From Swiss-Prot:
Family according to the record: Belongs to the RecO family.
Domain of life: Bacteria
Gene3D superfamilies for the chain: Nucleic acid-binding proteins, Recombination protein O, C-terminal domain
Protein's name in the database: DNA repair protein RecO
Gene Ontology process terms (BP): DNA recombination; double-strand break repair
Annotated SUPFAM superfamilies: ArfGap/RecO-like zinc finger, Nucleic acid-binding proteins
Keyword set includes Chloroplast: no
Alphabetized UniProt keyword annotations: DNA damage, DNA recombination, DNA repair
């Protein structure tokens, strides 16, 4: 019998049979993982098995390639943001993006920590900029980090104004020349310079979305609707 214990955030839950549930969690040391919770569809478990809930998890299975079963204990609920439409959309986008980007059972310790911090930040103003930075980390985890440190043409670190939609590298204003209208404008929010305005966050998400959408279809997984709903709410202000 195989067994481990870990801490994780609940990404999704679906009914399994009459009384059980299959949950998907993002754990600190075991990555994105699925398992059955016996009695998970019961009234007792319903308040615990909510998106974003932080759980103490024990997983058991006979063989490593079996789905296995979880026993769960609540550590922290995030139901406090459920009355905030934008924050709830942010939480749903986080859970959905982790589902489509991360392979199963592959540890991403740094990303797990940053994901928990982002979920915590949803209760306070200003989190959309943190969400943008988190999507940049997702790109890194997917193997395609943006290089915004210097101009791809000249090597200069000054006056970076655009991002190439082909390479994900920054381009200086002067170096862009006649190609400027074919490049993404580079918002300062992506460079971590100054406060991030709503339009800058949306510009940044257009860039991260372009590269995430380009990379993910290779695995047959388009960007989730939850992300589109978040961007729509951000655009409405």
């Amino acid at each position: 019998m195989l067994e481990w214990r870990d801490e994780g955030a609940l990404l999704s839950v679906r009914r399994h049979g009459e009384s059980a549930a299959i949950i998907e969690v993002f754990t600190a040391s075991h990555g994105r993982h699925l398992g059955v919770v016996r009695g998970g569809a019961s009234r007792r478990h319903a308040p615990v098995l909510q998106p974003g809930a932080q759980l103490d998890l024990t997983w058991k299975a006979r063989l490593d390639d079996h789905m296995g079963a979880f026993t769960v204990e609540p550590l922290r609920a995030r139901t406090g943001i459920f009355g905030d439409r934008l924050a709830l959309a942010g939480l749903n986008a986080i859970c959905a993006m982790l589902h489509v980007v991360l392979p199963e059972r592959e540890p991403h310790v740094g990303l797990w920590r940053e994901s928990i911090e982002l979920m915590d930040a949803l209760a306070a103003p200003g989190w959309p900029a943190a969400y943008l930075r988190w999507e940049m980390r997702l790109l890194e985890e997917a193997g395609f980090g943006l290089d915004l440190t210097r101009c791809a043409v000249t090597g200069s670190r000054e006056d970076l104004a655009f991002v190439s939609p082909r390479t994900g590298r920054a381009v200086g204003r002067a170096a862009a020349g006649d190609w400027a209208d074919r490049l993404f404008p580079l918002p300062l929010a992506l460079l971590g310079q100054g406060p991030a305005s709503g339009p800058e966050v949306r510009q940044g998400l257009a860039i991260t979305g372009h590269f995430l959408a380009r990379e993910l279809p290779l695995a047959g997984r388009p960007l989730p609707e939850a992300r589109a709903r978040l961007i729509d709410l951000l655009a409405r202000g």
